[in-house]
Structure formats: structure tokens, C-alpha cells
């Protein structure tokens, strides 16, 4: 299943977002990041072994990230901290089987998992979105395990 999963890590800034979107627009698997629902993790390295993270899902990663960087910084201080930090990055996770329900379940599982990680001092998104059955629900465990393997090997 590995070729179905796409994870990109970019610096958390408008400039890097725009550069990445241009690259994804011409890549073979870019549609899984730009035109499919995605899950994303924004992390900020506070010290050598201390991170704060935000886990989200969206149907439009470009516009959602712009909202976080431009408008949300005026509403919640942690968004300003993420945007001003030179150590913030964002993992964008796409998959050809992602639909809204599956991304909500992946987001929920990632929040639960990251809350248990010793080096993560804060997970800022605390809403839960557990879904009932849906078309690809039987793939949740396998896709989540693959994401965790790739994310933890890169983080």
C-alpha cells in the first residue's frame, strides 16, 4: 500500500506553501495533496526534546494553511507562535483512498497517538471527530499504521 500514501514535510510559511503547491501541481501524485482531503500536522520544536503540535484535516490544504497563517494568528496565540517560529514545519498527508470520513478518523487517531508521545508537550486541536462506518473504514487501521511508521521515521 506504500505507493498510495503521500507525506510531504514543508517549512510552515506562506512562501514554502506556495513553492510546494507549485511543485505538487506538476507532480504525478500531487492531486492527492491538492484535490483530495488531507490530514496535516504542524509541529514546532520548542527545545531539543519538546514539541507542540496541531493536527487538522481539510479538503483544501492551500486555503486552510493560508487561513491559519493569516487570520487564525489574530484569534489564538498558538497560531502566531507557529507562524513566527523558525522551527515550525508542516506534514501534509494524502492518500488516494482519503475521503472526508477517513481523514476525520485519521485526524482523531493522530491526536490520540500524539497525546501519548513523551516529547510532545501540547496537542492544540482537542476536538474529536470519530466517524461511524463508511466506504473505506476497513482501511483505517492499515493506513494509520503506515502514516505512523513514515511520520515517526521522519520526525
Predicted regions: what is each one?
Residues 137-150:
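Long, charge-rich alpha-helical interaction segments
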Residues 61-109, 113:
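Conserved short loop/helix modules at catalytic or binding sites
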Residues 102-128, 135:
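Domain-level recognition of nuclease-like catalytic cores that cleave nucleotide substrates
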Residues 30-36, 46-48:
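A short catalytic or substrate-binding loop motif that flags glycine-/basic-rich loops and adjacent residues
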Residues 53, 94-102, 132-135, 139:
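Conserved aromatic-histidine-acidic binding/catalytic patches
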Residues 40-42, 51-59:
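GIY-YIG nuclease signature motif recognition
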Residues 4-26:
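N-terminal, Lys/Arg-enriched amphipathic/low-complexity engagement segments
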Residues 151-155:
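Conserved small/polar residues in nucleotide/adenosyl-binding loops
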Amino acid at each position: 500500500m506504500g505507493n498510495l500514501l503521500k507525506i510531504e514535510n514543508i517549512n510552515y510559511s506562506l512562501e514554502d506553501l506556495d513553492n510546494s503547491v507549485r511543485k505538487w501541481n506538476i507532480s504525478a501524485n500531487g492531486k492527492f495533496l491538492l484535490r483530495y482531503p488531507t490530514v496535516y500536522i504542524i509541529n514546532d520544536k520548542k527545545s531539543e526534546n519538546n514539541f507542540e503540535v496541531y493536527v487538522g484535516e481539510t479538503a483544501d490544504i492551500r486555503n486552510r494553511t493560508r487561513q491559519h497563517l493569516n487570520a487564525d494568528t489574530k484569534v489564538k496565540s498558538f497560531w502566531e507562535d507557529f507562524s513566527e517560529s523558525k522551527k515550525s514545519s508542516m506534514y501534509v498527508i494524502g492518500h488516494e483512498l482519503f475521503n472526508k470520513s477517513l481523514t476525520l478518523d485519521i485526524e482523531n487517531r493522530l491526536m490520540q497517538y500524539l497525546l501519548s508521545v513523551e516529547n510532545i508537550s501540547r496537542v492544540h486541536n482537542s476536538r474529536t471527530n470519530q466517524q461511524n462506518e463508511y466506504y473505506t473504514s476497513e482501511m483505517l487501521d492499515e493506513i494509520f499504521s503506515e502514516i505512523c511508521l513514515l511520520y515517526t521515521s521522519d520526525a
